[in-house]
């Protein structure tokens, strides 16, 4: 499943959901609080880590604040993301042809739609893209998953390359 939607609300959470994915018990509460505290935020992302085979947390990924240059090199935004529903609609939502990297494709198009905000993610003094620096997503490592090996799903790399190529083609 690629997206969880809060249908009645204004927020969409494109979240890669796997049977072994775990959210921190307070993850949705922290996201809701952040949305309430930062009503102008268009996109909110969090830090994450992995769970080893024994279920122990490891490999924390403490992400930087918004960096358009880094996004072009990799999808550092990751898995737990909240985006304004209108923004997802404005960029056309998920595209089937980027299966395996739909989230990266969507993030690249959102950044472009927002005018590629400068580092820090602020537009007109308001937080357009906000980093919530808390580990709220735990990704279980297992064989056959990109959580264990970036080469586990070659089609995802190809889809990511296609998404980036399209983003750069429209930008330049």
Mark where each language-model region is.
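Short beta-strand-to-loop acidic/aromatic patch adjacent to the donor-nucleotide binding site
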Residues: 3, 9-22
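Phosphate/oxyanion-binding loops and surfaces in catalytic or ligand/nucleic-acid-binding neighborhoods
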Residues: 34, 38, 113, 139, ...
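Acidic/His-rich active-site region of diverse nucleotide-sugar glycosyltransferases
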Residues: 43-78, 134
